[in-house]
Every structure is written in structure tokens, then in C-alpha cells.
Amino acid sequence: MKSKRRILFPLLTLIALLLCLSPAFAGGETAKTGLGHAQASAVKWQADAVLVQIITVSGNMDGTAEKWSFLFHSPQAKKSYKVDVKNSKIDQTLEVSPSFTDAVDGDFMDSIQAMAEAKKKGLKGKSRAMMTLHVMLQGTKSQGAYWNIVSDQAEGRSTLINAKTGKFFRHQALK
């Protein structure tokens, strides 16, 4: 009887652990995971295309998302191009009017590190977060790329993380 318990208890513990962990890894990728696919598509669209924004409106609280949207701008064509990447594949592309034109330097921290820093500085959420990476100037000490994170429990504020240094910048009221 004792030998059955010795086998059964670790087995049940393993099953419980797997059930608890599986939602955290279900369908989530980091922002940088799909960036290569998006960039290749953007360069086919316009050779001078530069990354200007990354966004997910349905991110997970671990900094991953099922789908990321990448916005590129062509200074020569004066147009923008949106590339949606889902499950490491291009899901949809669309030429759009330019809204952002400042290029995001390729040397930025990934979404999971940005989310971890935001949580360290008080961001709370149940399961969902909107994450945006773009260049900001107004209201910052210096122009640069920032992660702007709003969770499903954001209480009227977003959390800004400097995407180059990985440091918390501030909480900002949503207007």
C-alpha cells in the first residue's frame, strides 16, 4: 500500500503542476519572436521600411501574446504598412496611412522583460494587458523607445518602461 502512495502522490503532484502551468504558456509569443517575419514582409513592401511601432491589444500578463502587430513606415513612399504575426506566421498585412514615423532602434528589450519590470513597479492584472512599443518624446526626459503597458486592472494608468535600458520610467494617467 505504501509503494502505491509513493508513486501516486508524485504523479498527482506532476499532473497538478502541469495543469497550473499550461495556461501561462498557451498561445503566447514575445514581441521579438515575430519581428523577423514582419521585417521580411515590410522590406518586400518597401525597401526603406523601418519599424515604428509594435502593439498587442490582447497580451498575457507574462509579456507574451497570441498576436502582435508591427507597424513599419516608408519615408520614401510616405506610407505605412501593418503586419500581423500570429503563431510565428504572417496573419495579415495592410498598407495604411502613416501615424508614427520615428524609427524604433532594433536594440530594445523584449516584451517579457518589459512586463516583468512593470510588475516590479506595481502593475497588477488578472490575465490581459495591452502593450505598445514606440518612440516617445513628449513628456519624457529624452526621445526614445518606450513600452507602454496597460493591464486589465490598470486603474486608469499606464506603465512606461524605457525599452533600451529596461528601467521603469513612470506611471501615466490614461486620458
Q: Residue spans of the language-model regions?
A:
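Bacterial N-terminal signal peptides
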Residues: 10-20
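Long, terminal "pre-/pro-" and other extracytoplasmic accessory regions
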Residues: 2-6, 20-175
